[in-house]
């Protein structure tokens, strides 16, 4: 099929919904989730017993989107016609659950976590733009997503350094 890094470009903002037969999944869940998933991994208040299964699920879903046999099984032993990656809603749900856990345990996030999370999300977008298919994920979609990631990173840093009210 295609590379996992290339398919992450489908998580870019303003990416058009794909309905072709090349099986590119529609993975957009918001640019904020791209930062939150890294903050989830770095957050010390979230136990590894919770992190490992969720991260393994994300990896399994990404591999399922990119592997022909797993995608065939996910689609009920049929090749999809014009609706690829039907299980992408499960991937997005796991991302959102991880994002919610990150926000819920916000006190476990440090300033350097935010910087690393933003840099990691930006790196993933750069790699997906470089290795992705420009016909499926436009260059401007990757650039706009990177701008959103930077804005979210700045806002999160401002939130972290804001004086605490008693």
Language-model features: where?
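Periplasmic/ER-lumenal interhelical loops and adjacent helix-loop junctions
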Residues: 1-53, 60-61, 67-75, 84-89, ...
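Contiguous transmembrane helix-bundle modules in multi-pass membrane proteins
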Residues: 55-65, 69, 78-166
